[in-house]
Swiss-Prot record:
The gene is pepP. The lineage of its organism: Eukaryota, Fungi, Dikarya, Ascomycota, Pezizomycotina. Its EC number is 3.4.11.9. Mn(2+) 1 binds at residues 309, 432, 472. Belongs to the peptidase M24B family. InterPro entries: Aminopep_P_N, Creatin/AminoP/Spt16_N, Creatinase/aminopeptidase-like, Pept_M24, X-Pro_dipept-like. It catalyses: Release of any N-terminal amino acid, including proline, that is linked to proline, even from a dipeptide or tripeptide. It is an enzyme of class 3 (hydrolase). Mn(2+) 2 binds at residues 298, 309, 472. This is Probable Xaa-Pro aminopeptidase pepP. Residues 12-25 have a biased composition (Polar residues). One of its GO terms (molecular function) is metalloaminopeptidase activity.
């Protein structure tokens, strides 16, 4: 299927390059137009998701990558899913989270499973737990072999009691065959005796590389997660008019996701009111809302192990204060301009640098920064207000594979980037600039003569209560541009309209 056949929303509609009408009838028409577009998008990605998760196609891609470094590779890829593990000092199981490497080649989200993929024949064998009569009493019948074969993109399904005999048989099919597995992810009772060699490094690296470029099914999964999360973000804005605490809004987000069959969060949600928004990964989510200017919500659900990662900032009083609007406009400009520069092969470091340039221009216009823009950039003073990276890969993990970060970079502007270098077409990335007023971060800059000459402390004092503003979308990189997978509102007129209702 052509990718664009199920992604009808183009850059013009999703990057909000057209200013919506602002009043009465025209505004109503605009809102209905966006609703119709979103409905069309839902229908399209739902159609894609009716197919099986493409585990075998992923396995073939992984084999191709293995053979780039090992041209004569043959044998078996053996992967295990997450095994059931009890809570410490308890007889209940830990919350289940499937191993992503196993899921990538199977689409199977069951515990205690395994996969054997024969490289020569491209045959995929899924192993599922046998029926335990004692467990059936409590949990009901598990998935049968026939049901698993119908549900998953595999050639054969067996019980896990057949793992060792099957591996022995496959090993004997070709001399000097190799078993490719992941270190510390093989059960003690599994043996590789008949294989000529064992490789515990190559397949993990190959899967990490393969996961960077998403196929149409994976993009549809991320889009579905985004659709549900965007609905939940809107629900939080609506609920904020009557809520008294961050906790109530946290509950609203969870309720909306769970009610749409997405109970798993991609990460611990952040709901930070007022100055708490200056803490990048604020986790308390329990402070009162009264007297606070804004709420920053960074939250996203998973859909079948694929993440969304969305951040919005909105006024708690229905309308941004002057200072909050000042900062919001800068961050929105940072986000839009960086998004417009995205296309396959672009260098992420360049986008991050551009975001800092936009931030510096905006803060100079407000008088928070003073002096020459180039000198401020060269001194890295803008890192006092924008201390994190512009974004990261997104997929089965919120901070997905392939980012190539360098936490030891001597340049503080790039040290915290989770994504570096060229970004290929097909990747999904976040674009999440922000400006923050964190005393802990900014004070050392004010005490340092290298930076203090560029910061007007008197003007800065007007902005502490803003806390922080971050805006984050999930972007699918294409050969010549991008597709924005996030539909949550972010234009000031839209945000204030929903906040004020």
């Amino acid at each position: 299927m052509n990718y664009h056949s199920f992604l009808p929303l183009r850059r013009s509609s999703l990057s909000h390059s057209t200013t919506p009408p602002s009043k009465s009838r025209n505004q109503t028409r605009y809102i209905w137009s966006i609703a119709l577009q979103n409905t069309m998008a839902v229908e399209d990605f739902e159609a894609v998701l009716k197919a099986k998760y493409p585990g075998k196609a992923h396995a073939k891609r992984v084999v191709d990558l293995i053979r780039k470094t090992k041209p004569d590779a043959n044998g078996v890829i053996y992967l295990e899913g997450r095994m059931t593990k009890l809570l410490e000092d308890n007889d209940s199981p830990e919350p289940f989270r499937q191993r992503r490497f196993f899921y990538y080649l199977t689409g199977c989200n069951l515990a205690d499973c395994a996969l054997a993929y024969d490289i020569q024949s491209s045959k995929s064998i899924l192993f599922i737990p046998p029926i335990d009569p004692d467990d059936v009493i409590w949990s009901g019948l598990p998935l049968s072999i026939d049901e698993a074969l119908s549900r998953y993109d595999v050639d054969e399904v067996k019980f896990t009691t057949e793992v060792n005999p099957t591996l022995t048989h496959l090993a004997k099919q070709s001399p000097n065959s190799t078993v490719f597995a992941i270190a510390n992810q093989v059960s003690d009772n599994v043996t590789f005796i008949e294989f000529g060699s064992k490789d515990f490094e190559t397949v993990k690296k190959a899967i990490e590389v393969s996961r960077v470029v998403k196929d149409e099914f994976e993009v549809a999964m991320i889009r579905k997660a985004n659709h549900i999360s965007s609905l939940a973000h809107k629900a939080v804005i609506e609920r904020s008019k009557t809520a008294a605490t961050e906790q109530e809004l946290y509950a609203t987000f969870l309720e909306r996701c769970v009610s749409h069959a997405a109970p798993e969060m991609a990460y611990h949600p952040i709901l930070a009111a007022g100055k708490a928004a200056a803490t990048l990964h604020y986790v308390d989510n329990n402070a009162p809302l009264k007297g606070k200017q804004n709420l920053l919500i960074d939250a996203g659900c998973e859909w079948n192990n694929y993440a969304s990662d969305i951040t919005r900032t909105f006024p708690l009083t229905g309308k941004f204060t002057k200072e909050s609007r000042d900062i919001y406009d800068i961050v929105l400009r940072m986000q839009k301009e960086c998004t417009e520069l995205i296309k396959g092969g672009m260098i992420w470091d360049d986008l991050h640098l551009h975001a800092h340039k936009v931030a510096i221009d905006g803060l100079l216009a407000l008088g928070i920064l003073k002096g020459d823009a180039k000198e401020i950039l060269d001194a890295r003073t803008s890192a006092a207000f924008f201390p994190h990276g512009l974004g990261h890969h997104l997929g089965m993990d919120t901070h997905d594979t392939g980012g190539n970060p360098n936490p030891n970079d001597p340049d503080k502007l790039f040290r915290y980037l989770r994504l570096r270098g060229h970004v290929p077409a097909g990747a999904v990335v976040t674009v999440e600039p922000g400006i923050y007023f964190c005393d802990f971060i900014i004070k050392p800059y004010l005490d340092d003569h290298v930076h203090s000459k560029y910061i007007d402390a008197a003007v800065l004092n007007k902005y502490w209560d803003v806390g922080g503003v971050r805006i984050e979308d999930n972007i699918h990189v294409t050969e010549n541009g991008y597709v924005n997978l996030t539909t949550a509102i972010k234009e000031v007129s839209d945000v204030e309209a929903v906040s004020a209702k």
